[in-house]
């Protein structure tokens, strides 16, 4: 599984890429592989305020519907509208064009609670399954 070194990870299989006080969020390669073919994404509303661990949107695949959780507290500033017409971007490019939303970070200290790439690799290597969130 692809686990980029420049990201941080939630135990529920979301990734977070920091850009100053903002962050981009999507689901991991492991999560998309467990879901199989993504057919629909319910995007979060721009302006929505969320807390870390709060369910923010839903990704549906031919296999299951999965809640997606915000890995950090803040305000949604953008949603990836390209997923409305091409939800398979989550499968083909989960860390690039398949991003789901952007968030203005409210509580920077929450970043410390996320997993490093190495910790996330341990989680998916030892779990034998998708765990929570998938």
For the regions a language model picked out, list residue spans one by one.
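Aromatic- and Lys/Arg-enriched surface recognition patch
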Residues: 77-101
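Short, charged/polar surface micro-motifs in flexible loops or helix N-caps
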Residues: 32-33, 46, 73-76, 81-83
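Short, glycine/small-residue-enriched coil/turn segments at secondary-structure junctions
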Residues: 2-4, 68, 72
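Short, Lys/Arg- and Gly-enriched loop/turn segments at beta-strand edges
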Residues: 60-69, 86-88
């Amino acid at each position: 599984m692809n686990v980029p070194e420049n990201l941080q990870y939630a135990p529920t299989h979301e990734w977070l890429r920091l850009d100053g006080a903002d962050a981009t969020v999507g689901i991991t390669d492991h999560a998309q592989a467990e879901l199989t073919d993504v057919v629909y994404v319910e995007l979060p509303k721009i302006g929505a305020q969320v807390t870390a661990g709060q369910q923010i949107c839903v990704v549906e695949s031919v296999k299951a519907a999965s809640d997606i959780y915000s890995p950090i507290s803040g305000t949604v500033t953008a949603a990836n509208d390209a997923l409305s017409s091409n939800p398979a971007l989550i499968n083909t490019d989960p860390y690039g064009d398949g991003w789901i939303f952007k968030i203005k970070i409210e509580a920077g200290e929450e970043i410390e609670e996320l997993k490093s790439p190495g910790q996330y690799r341990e989680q998916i290597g030892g779990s034998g399954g998708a765990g929570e969130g998938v």
